[in-house]
Amino acid sequence: MGMLEVRELLCERDERTLFSGLSFTLNAGEWVQITGSNGAGKTMLLRLLTGLSRPDAGEVLWQGQPLHQVRDSYHQNLLWIGHQPGIKTRLTALENLHFYHRDGDTAQCLEALAQAGLAGFEDIPVNQLSAGQQRRVALARLWLTRATLWILDEPFTAIDVNGVDRLTQRMAQHTEQGGIVILTTHQPLNVAESKIRRISLTQTRAV
């Protein structure tokens, strides 16, 4: 039994099948990239894995239990960062981290922002930051979260090369410690092929 299991998922949108018969199992320490053409359903699959959307058929299980039966404990073990940063634009970068990680002290939050490349921007309201900087505020949570499962939709959007390398290193560290990372990205990952498992969506199945 894996940590996260997908059984025979069917997803249809606007009378079109995005994927069907989709099944896979993820174990502790796995790093997975969901690939596929535009419109293949990559973001929708991530939403199904988070429980934000429901499949037309099939189910997702966490530690052997359907998500709807373990929703609270699952979400405690999940960090989801979608296309939108999901941050409070009227708060500063530091205030955002305090909001999402109330058990993190100021020193930890400052270190997380520094790791994300935001040293010197801690006290600036997020609505005054660039798109890339706003993305970094959300991604700074990777240095604070205790969640086992990270699901990240295009995390490198508007991030420069150095930032991508730093984030990639953090993801590698998380999987080496037994965590699971699932992401979509159009950018090449600068890591050994052996470390990445790729699930490619086609119209009917995953390869």
Curated annotation (Swiss-Prot):
ATP binds at G36, S37, N38, G39, A40, G41, K42, T43. Residues 4-207 form the ABC transporter domain. One of its GO terms (molecular function) is ATP binding. Pfam families: ABC_tran. InterPro entries: AAA+_ATPase, ABC_transporter-like_ATP-bd, ABC_transporter-like_CS, ABC_transptr_haem_export_CcmA, P-loop_NTPase. Gene3D superfamilies: P-loop containing nucleotide triphosphate hydrolases. One of its GO terms (biological process) is cytochrome complex assembly. GO terms for cellular component: plasma membrane. It is a peripheral membrane protein. Keywords: ATP-binding, Cell inner membrane, Cell membrane, Cytochrome c-type biogenesis, Membrane, Nucleotide-binding, Translocase, Transport. It comes from the Bacteria. Its EC number is 7.6.2.5. It is found in: Cell inner membrane. It catalyses: heme b(in) + ATP + H2O = heme b(out) + ADP + phosphate + H(+). Part of the ABC transporter complex CcmAB involved in the biogenesis of c-type cytochromes; once thought to export heme, this seems not to be the case, but its exact role is uncertain. Responsible for energy coupling to the transport system. The complex is composed of two ATP-binding proteins (CcmA) and two transmembrane proteins (CcmB). Belongs to the ABC transporter superfamily. CcmA exporter (TC 3.A.1.107) family. This is Cytochrome c biogenesis ATP-binding export protein CcmA. It comes from Shigella dysenteriae serotype 1 (strain Sd197).
